[in-house]
Design a protein with these regions (language model features):
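Transmembrane beta-barrel outer-membrane domains
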Residues: 84-90, 117-123, 181-187, 233-239, ...
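Transmembrane beta-strands of outer-membrane beta-barrel proteins
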Residues: 58-62, 106-110, 140-147, 206-210, ...
Length: 290
C-alpha cells in the first residue's frame, strides 16, 4: 500500500497542468504588466497629417530596465525567484500609410531575434491616428493602438538555475532543464498627444498620455525533477503612461525621434520595496517617408 501511494504521488507530480487568474497587483501580475509595458505600442511621435497614399517607414529601439534580485521574487505570490532580466532592449519596425480625412494607418512588427534567452514571436501591432487640432503654436492628435503576440523566455528555469543542484538555494523549484515559458503581451489603448511648435521648424517637442488595457498571460512549461510543470497564469488591468519626446526633422523625409515613457505600476509584495516597481524607459526612433 505504501509503495502504491508513492507511485500515485509521483504520477500526479509528473504532469501538473492548471490555470489561474491573478490580481494585477500580485507579484505575478505585476511581472506580466512590467514585461507588457516594455512592448507598449505607443506613438513614436505625435499624429501627423500625411497625404493619402504616402508611405512612412520607421524603426525604433527602446530600453528595458533591469530588475533587482528582490524585484524578481514573483513566483508563488512573491516567494520564488524568477529570471526576469532578459533582453535589455526592445525594437520594432513600423509602416505608416496615409488615408483620407487626415487619418494614418499603421502596422508594426518586432523581428524574432533572441537576446539573453528571450525571443519575440508573431508580435504585431496596429494603430490608427489623426491630428484633430493644428494651431500655430500647438497641436493635438489622437491615436488608437493594439498589440498581439508572444515572447518566449526561460524565466522559470534559466540556464544559470539549471546548473545548480535541485532543491537547493538558487534552484528551489527543482529545475533540471531550461523552461520554455511563453508570455503573451496583448494590449490595446488610446493615446492623446500635444505638439508644441515653439522651437522652430526642425525641432518639435511633444507630450503624450496613454490609457492602456493590458491582458497578459504566461504559460509556464518547466522540466522539474519530479515532473513537468505546466501552468497557465492570466491577469488583466489598466495602466496610464506619460511620454515626453522631441522630434528633429533633418529634412522633409528624414525625422529623428527621442522620447522617454513612464508607466506607474503597483505591486503588493510580502516585503515592500518602496516606489521602484514602475516602468520607465527611453526610446530612439528614425522615420523615412517615401
Amino acid at each position: 500500500m505504501h509503495r502504491f501511494l508513492q507511485i500515485l504521488i509521483l504520477y500526479t507530480l509528473s504532469s501538473s497542468l492548471f490555470s489561474q487568474n491573478v490580481d494585477f497587483e500580485r507579484p505575478e501580475g505585476w511581472a506580466m504588466a512590467f514585461t507588457t509595458a516594455s512592448s507598449l505600442n505607443l506613438g513614436q511621435s505625435t499624429p501627423q497629417k500625411i497625404s493619402p497614399g504616402e508611405l512612412i517607414l520607421s524603426a525604433e529601439l527602446s530600453s528595458i530596465p533591469s530588475l533587482s534580485k528582490e524585484q524578481q521574487k514573483v513566483g508563488f505570490n512573491g516567494l520564488k525567484d524568477e529570471d526576469l532580466n532578459k533582453s535589455p532592449i526592445f525594437g520594432r519596425i513600423r509602416i505608416s500609410y496615409g488615408l483620407p480625412w487626415d487619418t494614418t494607418a499603421e502596422i508594426s512588427w518586432t523581428p524574432p531575434f533572441e537576446i539573453d534567452g528571450a525571443k519575440p514571436e508573431n508580435l504585431w501591432g496596429f494603430a490608427f491616428s489623426r491630428p484633430f487640432i493644428q494651431l500655430e503654436k500647438i497641436g493635438l492628435g489622437i491615436r488608437i493602438f493594439m498589440t498581439r503576440g508572444d515572447v518566449k523566455a526561460d524565466v522559470t528555469c534559466s540556464e544559470e538555475m539549471v546548473a545548480i543542484e535541485p532543491y537547493t538555494p538558487g534552484n528551489l523549484s527543482g529545475c533540471i532543464g531550461i523552461s520554455r515559458d511563453v508570455l503573451t503581451v496583448d494590449h490595446h489603448g488610446l493615446e492623446a498627444a500635444l505638439t508644441f511648435n515653439t522651437l522652430g521648424k526642425k525641432i518639435t517637442p511633444w507630450l503624450a498620455v496613454a490609457l492602456t488595457r493590458m491582458e497578459p498571460s504566461v504559460r509556464v512549461d518547466a522540466p522539474l525533477q519530479y515532473g513537468q510543470e505546466i501552468v497557465d497564469i492570466y491577469s488583466q488591468g489598466t495602466t496610464q503612461t506619460l511620454s515626453i519626446g522631441i522630434s528633429y526633422d533633418f529634412n522633409e523625409r528624414n525625422v529623428l525621434n527621442l522620447s522617454t515613457s513612464y508607466t506607474p505600476l503597483d505591486v503588493i509584495r510580502p516585503v515592500s520595496l518602496g516606489d521602484r516597481d514602475s516602468f520607465w524607459n527611453f526610446k530612439l526612433g528614425y522615420s523615412f517617408s517615401f
